[in-house]
Amino acid sequence: MFKRKDWLIIVIALLLALGLFVLTRSGIQFGLPGDNDPMRVLTEINPPANADTIQEPVQAYLVLNVGNTRYKPLPLTREAIYRLHQSDGRDNVIHVTRDSVYMESANCDNQDCIKQGMVDFVNRDARVLSNMIICLPNQVVLELMTPEEAGVNAQ
């Protein structure tokens, strides 16, 4: 009925299917090089109807890490609230201003990321976590950086 090669093909197909299943369930995010725009995973809550027309130099950047993915620095040009919703239901709400960031809410159990408070350029050297806010259960790390630290030219 089935020859040796048929069984080999069936076993290989099953192993490939099992491997893909494990990869999709592991939470590892895959993307194309250059596909690390933070606005791909962030949704602004109540964006303003009209954007500011005054172009001031960017003083701060938010670097977002979700799981194993590090996103490009997001310039902080105005006050905004962003929602980070992951496909497995993990949610974080991030509040940013031109020079600060804090975790407004999260659906993690311990809420340590919210208790870490605001990071700005005045307090970041005195904080235990320096310029970072970390949500371990949701695998989210927020970093407040200067343009030089973020590796971008000051605008």
Protein language model features and the residues they cover:
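Hydrophobic membrane-insertion alpha-helices, especially the h-region
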Residues: L8-R25
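Glycine- and acidic-residue-biased ligand/ion/polar-headgroup-sensing regions
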Residues: A60, G89-N110, N138
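Extracytoplasmic/periplasm-facing segments of secreted or lipoprotein envelope proteins
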Residues: Y61-D91, R98
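C-terminal partner/receptor-binding element of secreted or periplasmic proteins
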Residues: D125-Q155
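Short extracytoplasmic/periplasmic juxtamembrane "stem" segments immediately C-terminal to an N-terminal membrane anchor
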Residues: G34-L64
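Short, Lys/Arg-rich N-terminal segment immediately upstream of the first membrane anchor
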Residues: M1-R4
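N-terminal post-signal-peptidase region of extra-cytosolic proteins
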Residues: E79-I81, C113-R124
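Aromatic-capped interface at the extracytoplasmic side
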Residues: V22-N36
